[in-house]
C-alpha cells in the first residue's frame, strides 16, 4: 500500500488532516467501521434524492450519473458492513452525523440555488472523505483496512469531481467558484468544531493550508 500522500496536494480543502487523527481513530476500528457504514448509506440516499431533482435539459445524463453514484455508494456500504460484521460489530438503529448535518444547513432554499448548493455540499463531503480515506490507508497497520481505504480513494475522488462538474454547468462559473470557496471554508470550520472520536468526520486539530491560498479544485 503506497504511503505517499502527495496526491492530497491537488485537493481543494482549506485544512489538512494530520496523521495523528488517523492513528487515534484506528485504535477503535469497529466503531470507525460502524460510522463509515452509515456514511456510505447516507451517500447512497443523497444520490437517490438528487436523482429526482433533475434541473432540466441543460444537464443531460443526470439520472444516469446519480444512479451510478448511488450504485457505487451501495457497493461501498456492502463492503464496509462485511468487514464490520466479520469483526464482531453491528449497525446501530440510530446514528448522528453533526458534521454533515451542519454542512447541509448551509444549503439555500429554492431552486436553482438549492440544487447548486446540494451539489457543492455533496462535493465538499466527498473530497473530505477522500482525504480521510487516504490518511487512514497511510496510517493503518491493519493490512485489510489499509487496502480497503486506499481503494476507496479513487472512487470518492471521482464522486467529488462528478458533483463539482455538475455544479459548474448550472450557473456562471465565477459565481459557482465563489460559492464553492465559501462552502470549503465553512467545511474546514465545521470539521474543526467536531468532537474527537472514531468517526470518519470527527474533529482534530486541523492545520490550515496557507501556502498559495485555497485551491479551486479544478
Task: List each language-model region with its residue ranges.
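Non-heme di-metal
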Residues: 1-218
Amino acid at each position: 500500500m503506497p504511503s505517499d500522500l502527495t496526491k492530497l496536494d491537488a485537493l481543494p480543502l482549506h485544512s489538512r488532516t494530520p496523521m495523528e487523527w488517523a492513528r487515534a481513530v484506528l485504535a477503535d476500528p469497529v466503531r470507525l467501521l460502524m460510522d463509515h457504514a452509515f456514511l456510505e448509506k447516507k451517500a447512497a440516499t443523497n444520490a437517490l434524492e438528487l436523482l429526482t431533482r433533475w434541473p432540466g435539459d441543460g444537464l443531460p445524463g443526470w439520472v444516469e450519473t446519480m444512479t451510478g453514484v448511488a450504485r457505487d455508494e451501495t457497493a461501498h456500504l456492502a463492503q464496509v458492513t462485511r468487514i464490520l460484521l466479520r469483526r464482531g460489530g453491528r449497525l446501530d438503529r440510530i446514528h448522528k452525523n453533526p458534521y454533515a448535518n451542519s454542512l447541509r444547513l448551509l444549503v439555500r432554499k429554492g431552486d436553482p440555488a438549492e440544487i447548486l448548493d446540494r451539489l457543492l455540499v455533496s462535493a465538499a463531503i466527498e473530497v473530505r472523505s477522500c482525504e480521510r480515506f487516504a490518511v487512514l490507508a497511510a496510517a493503518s497497520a491493519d493490512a485489510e483496512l489499509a487496502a480497503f481505504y486506499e481503494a476507496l480513494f479513487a472512487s470518492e475522488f471521482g464522486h467529488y469531481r462528478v458533483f463539482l462538474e455538475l455544479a459548474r454547468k448550472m450557473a456562471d462559473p465565477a459565481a459557482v467558484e465563489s460559492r464553492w470557496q465559501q462552502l470549503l471554508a465553512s467545511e474546514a470550520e465545521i470539521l474543526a468544531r467536531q468532537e474527537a472520536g472514531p468517526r470518519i468526520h470527527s474533529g482534530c486539530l486541523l492545520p490550515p493550508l496557507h501556502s498559495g491560498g485555497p485551491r479551486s479544485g479544478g
